Regions:
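Surface-exposed molecular-recognition determinants
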Residues: 1-353
Length: 353
C-alpha cells in the first residue's frame, strides 16, 4: 500500500509571496500547472510599521467577501480586497489589506470544491465545498444557538475545525483533537483553551458531522462559516507535543516535510505562531513568523515576542528555543501541511533538509 496518496501537495495547498502596488492584481501561483483554485484563501501583510489585518475569503461566500481572522468583525463585501478565485491563483483589488504599495504579502490557499453543494447529514442543513482526498471542507450554515450537528462531507473525522459567525462581535471558535471535545481555542485571541460543554456539546466529530452546543463561540444564532480538516498521511497532521522548557526543544514527527506550521500553547495565554517554508527557507534559527491573533508584521512579531528558532525538516519540525510561547512546560497543539511526503506513492524518498 502506498505511503501517501498525495505525491504532490501543491495540488491542494500553495503559498505565494507577492508585492503590493496600490492597484488591482491577478496573482498567479509559482507552480507552472494551472489547476489549483484556492477555494479557501488567507492573505497577510508581511512588512511595514502600519499594521493591517489578516484576510480570509472562501469560494462559498464568493469573491468580494472576506473576514479578518484576528478580529471579531462581521463578514464584509468589498471588491477591492479578494475579488476572484482563479484556476491558477486569485485576483485582488488595491485595498491596503492585500495590495498596499511597497508592502510584501503572503497568501496561503487550499483547494476544496468550488461553490459547494447542499448537505443534510446534520440537524442543521449546510452548504459544503469539500475535497475528500485532501481532507479539506468549507461549510456554510446558519447557527441556531441550540445543540445540533452539522454535516461536513469529509468522509473522515475532522481533527481541526475553525468556525466564525459572519455577524459582528463573535470570536473564531477553534476545535483541535488534541484538546478534546470539551475545550475550544479562539483563533483571534492569545488566551488558553476554555473548557465548557457548550462548545462542542461534549461530542467528538464523526466522519459525517460535527457537533456544536449552545455557546456563541461555536454556534451563534446567525449565518456562519467553518473550515474543517481531516488528517491525510504524508500531507497533513494535527497533533500535540509536550514542551521541555529547554533550548534543545522537542522534535515533532510528521511523516512529511512541512511547508506550513501553526502552533498554539493550549493551556496558557501565549500567541499563535504561524511559519511557512516560503518565508523561512534556510532553517537559520530565526523563522519568519506571523500571529493569526494579531495584525503584527513579521518585524513587529519579532520585536514584540522575539525570534522563533524552528527548523522545518524532511520528516517534521524541531523547536530550538526554551521560549514559553512554543516550548514551555505545557502541551502545545499544532496544524501542519506538507511540502512533500517522506516517500511518495512509488516509495521514492524526498530530499532531506
Amino acid at each position: 500500500m502506498a505511503y501517501s496518496t498525495i505525491d504532490d501537495p501543491t495540488n491542494f495547498f500553495r503559498i505565494k509571496l507577492y508585492n503590493g502596488n496600490n492597484n488591482a492584481q491577478n496573482i498567479a501561483w509559482d507552480e507552472t500547472d494551472t489547476n489549483m483554485q484556492p477555494d479557501l484563501l488567507w492573505i497577510k501583510t508581511r512588512s511595514g510599521n502600519t499594521v493591517f489585518n489578516h484576510v480570509i475569503g472562501n469560494a462559498i461566500s464568493g469573491g468580494d467577501k472576506y473576514l479578518h481572522p484576528n478580529t471579531t468583525a462581521a463578514e464584509t463585501s468589498n471588491a477591492n480586497v479578494i475579488h476572484t478565485f482563479n484556476s491558477n491563483g486569485f485576483s485582488i483589488g488595491g485595498a491596503t489589506f492585500v495590495s498596499e504599495g511597497a508592502r510584501t504579502y503572503v497568501a496561503w490557499g487550499w483547494k476544496a470544491n468550488g461553490s459547494g453543494s447542499s448537505n443534510s447529514n446534520g440537524n442543521i442543513s449546510s452548504t459544503v465545498s469539500v475535497d475528500q482526498s485532501a481532507g479539506c471542507s468549507i461549510v456554510s450554515y446558519t447557527g441556531t444557538g441550540s445543540a445540533a450537528t452539522i454535516g461536513h462531507g469529509l468522509g473522515a473525522i475532522p481533527k481541526f475545525i475553525i468556525n466564525k459567525s459572519k455577524a459582528d462581535g463573535e470570536h473564531w471558535g477553534t476545535y483541535h483533537e488534541g484538546l478534546g471535545n470539551g475545550k475550544a481555542l479562539a483563533l483571534n485571541l492569545h488566551d488558553g483553551a476554555g473548557t465548557n460543554s457548550s462548545y462542542w456539546n461534549n461530542t467528538t466529530p464523526t466522519d459525517s458531522v460535527w457537533s456544536v452546543g449552545t455557546s456563541p463561540l461555536t454556534n451563534d444564532n446567525s449565518a456562519s462559516v467553518a473550515f474543517l480538516f481531516a488528517e491525510k498521511k504524508g500531507y497533513s497532521k494535527f497533533g500535540t507535543y509536550s514542551g521541555n522548557n529547554n533550548a534543545d526543544g522537542p522534535f515533532v514527527y510528521l511523516g512529511f516535510r512541512p511547508t506550513w506550521v501553526l502552533i498554539k500553547d493550549g493551556g496558557s495565554g501565549q500567541h499563535w505562531h504561524l511559519v511557512d517554508s516560503k518565508r523561512d527557507v534556510g532553517n537559520d534559527g530565526d523563522a519568519q513568523q506571523l500571529s493569526p491573533n494579531t495584525d503584527d508584521s513579521e518585524a513587529e512579531v519579532k520585536s514584540n515576542r522575539g525570534t522563533l528558532p524552528l527548523d522545518l525538516l524532511s520528516n517534521g519540525f524541531k523547536v530550538r528555543t526554551d521560549g514559553s510561547s512554543c516550548n514551555g512546560t505545557g502541551s502545545f497543539v499544532y496544524a501542519a501541511f506538507a511540502e512533500s511526503p517522506i516517500v511518495n506513492s512509488e516509495s521514492i524518498p524526498n530530499n532531506a533538509r
